[in-house]
Structure formats: structure tokens, C-alpha cells
């Protein structure tokens, strides 16, 4: 079986390393960084994106609204199914730095509050900011390390179904815990803070940014200009 990282203790699992020799792939290639930001101008998702579960083509489209990623809601029956930790159609991206800011523009058709566009930091402890199709911004937390639940912290009516959502990683306590700040804007310039939360790594990998549309079957949201700085 392959061993991840280095086999520091023979017979046990490998451990991560800061540097590793590149494999011989038959040619020389320049060192490049893994992409983070995405303008969704391609007709294929970049390799930096990972689905929470085995993906389905009906979960997203890069052609319905060119220059945007359209994510569709799944027909999930219970409240617990719609918790982000349990959501299969969650599009995620591993963190590439200990501090950074992720911002995305979201828009969706007006509705009655059954669907919402989500920007999240997902892990065993997580948080997210979402815009509902009623024009309400929500800030929610989840804890699947001890409590196995998700709850709303606060919400605010903004009167529009188009807004900018932002998550800022402001500090890392250690390799497993970090603090994040949640905010939103209706014009892309003036961001209003909704609070801060503590996040944790996932079960097998570190914390990740995540995008999703949560709600009823047939609902959708468009995401554009995903920017990480």
C-alpha cells in the first residue's frame, strides 16, 4: 500500500512532510502554485475543487450562466440532511495558507426562503454565511466534533437576492484549529461583519472553503468571481 508523506516509524502510517521530492514524470516542469481563485470562465471545474461525495452532473453547470458556477439544490428530506456536514453536493477547496480571505458574489431568483446560497468553512467545527432567496443573510455554525448539530447565530434582511459573501481566516491556533470572521456586502465594497467562529479540520483532511445551494429540488444559485487573497 502507498504511504502518505514519510514513514517515520516502520510499520505505522506515514506522516505529512513540508517538502517532498517530485516524482519522475519524464520531463521538467516549472514550479507552480495550486490555483485558489476562480472566475468560472472555463467549461470545466478546476482541479482545486473537490466534491463532498461522488459527484453528479446535475449538481452544477458552468454553461447555463456563462462566467458563473450554477449550483443546484438536492431533494433532501430532513433538516439534518441539509446540515452542511452531511451535504453531498458541497463543492470544497482545501486551504492553501494559514491566513486568507475568500469572497464570492452570489445571486439567485427571488423565492419564499426555501433556498440559499452558501459560502462556508467546513470541518468538524464550521461556520457559513448564506443568502436566501427571500433576501436574508444568515450566519450559522455547526459542531460535529461533540454536538452533531448546526444552528443559526444571526440573520439580517438585505432586501436583495444578489450579494457578496466573505469568510476571513484571521488566525490559526494550531494545526487543527483556526478563527474565522464572517461578513457580507450588497455592493462589493462595504462589508458588514456578522461575527467570528472557531473551525476545526475535517476527519481525514484539513478545513476547506465550500460553496453550496441548499434547499428544495430545482432551486439554484449562481456563484461568480470566487477570490482568495
Annotate the PLM regions:
Residues 1-229:
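Extracellular glycan-recognition regions
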